[in-house]
Each structure stands twice: as structure tokens, then as C-alpha cells.
Regions:
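Residue-level detector of conserved, function-critical positions
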Residues: 2-187
Length: 187
């Protein structure tokens, strides 16, 4: 979702700076480096451009525009995050999933929660997801790498992720294999 502060991004397509501005009264718009409005349309919220697209909010729903200000992914989502590695996290009917830059669903909106990582939620190519109060991990194609069986989990760092099961801590690798069993009181 949009940050209430100004966000700047270098547009790869136009080689000019596009600044996303969100005002306290719920108006979002884009300006160039000299403060000139870039698009006629204003939104309820905006985010910076990543991979040539920016999140925009219209009628309380999120979608994406290109660097010409054209809506290329309709504003149909309850929430959205910026693109990274060709994917954007989106929310529909209180569930999270991922779409690609064409607006195609890559990972269906079936997860209650996702990693808190700012952009898409992927770390070491995996996203932490929650279903029915349990955590697991999926890859960028939506394949379950570690099933949602953990009471708690943290994002991957250097190939390992902290997991907790039955009040005991351990670690799994990026293949979902347990490398340190959940037998420890803390990590």
C-alpha cells in the first residue's frame, strides 16, 4: 500500500524521475522532479513505480498504472504491494496472493497472511504464508515448499528460516527440510 511520505522512483521506460505523493486528506498523485503534475487523474492513494508500474487506489480498491498514467491492471484488489521480481502481492476477500505484471494470477488469493517484507514478501525466493493459524512457505510459482504446519516462522536469511512448533524452535532450509529440529526453547 502507499506510504504517506513522498516516494521517488527512476522510471526505466522514460528515464525521468516520477514522484508519488500522498496527501493527509487522501489524495494521491504523481509529479516530475520539478513538481509538475504528470497525469490528469488523481487517486485515493499511490505508491512509487517499480518495474514500470505503480499501485493506485480508486473507489477504495487497488490496481496498477503504467508510466503513462494508464490503468493496466484494474482497481479490483482490497490491498496491493509494489512489484518485485515480476510479482506483486494482492489481497481479495481478506486473502493474499500474487499477480504478474500482466495482471494474471500466479498464486491465488488463498492465504490469510503473508510475510511482512515490504515489497512482495519473498526472501531467498520463498514467501512466508499463513493458513488457518499455521505458517509455511511457498515459492514464486506458488508451489508449497514447507506446508503450513508451524505455529510461527520468520523469513529466510542465508538459506535458513526460524520455525516454531509446539512451543519449541528450530530451523528449516529453502527446500523445506528441517535442519535443526524444533526441540529448543529459544533461538
Amino acid at each position: 500500500m502507499a506510504n504517506p511520505n513522498e516516494q521517488a522512483a527512476q522510471s526505466l521506460q522514460t528515464s525521468k524521475v516520477i514522484i508519488a505523493v500522498n496527501t493527509p486528506n487522501g489524495v494521491g498523485y504523481f509529479v516530475d522532479s520539478e513538481g509538475r503534475f504528470l497525469f490528469k487523474k488523481q487517486f485515493e492513494g499511490v505508491s512509487k513505480f517499480t518495474e514500470g508500474l505503480a499501485c493506485v487506489k480508486q473507489n477504495d480498491k487497488w490496481g496498477f498504472i503504467n508510466t503513462q498514467g494508464e490503468v493496466v491492471i484494474p482497481c479490483i484488489y482490497d490491498g496491493a504491494r509494489n512489484f518485485s521480481e515480476g510479482l506483486a502481492r494482492v489481497k481479495q476477500n481478506r486473502k493474499w496472493g500474487f499477480i504478474n505484471t500482466k495482471g494474471e494470477v500466479v498464486i491465488p488469493c488463498i492465504y490469510d497472511k503473508m510475510s511482512s517484507l515490504f515489497l512482495t514478501g519473498f526472501s531467498d525466493g520463498l514467501a512466508r504464508v499463513e493458513q488457518n493459524g499455521k505458517w509455511g512457505f511457498i515459492n514464486t510459482k506458488g508451489r508449497v515448499v514447507a506446508p503450513c504446519i508451524y505455529d510461527d516462522a520468520r523469513d529466510f536469511s542465508e538459506g535458513l528460516a526460524y520455525v516454531k512448533q509446539n512451543d519449541k524452535c528450530g530451523f528449516i532450509n529453502t527446500q523445506g527440510d528441517v535442519v535443526v529440529p524444533c526441540i529448543y526453547d529459544g533461538a
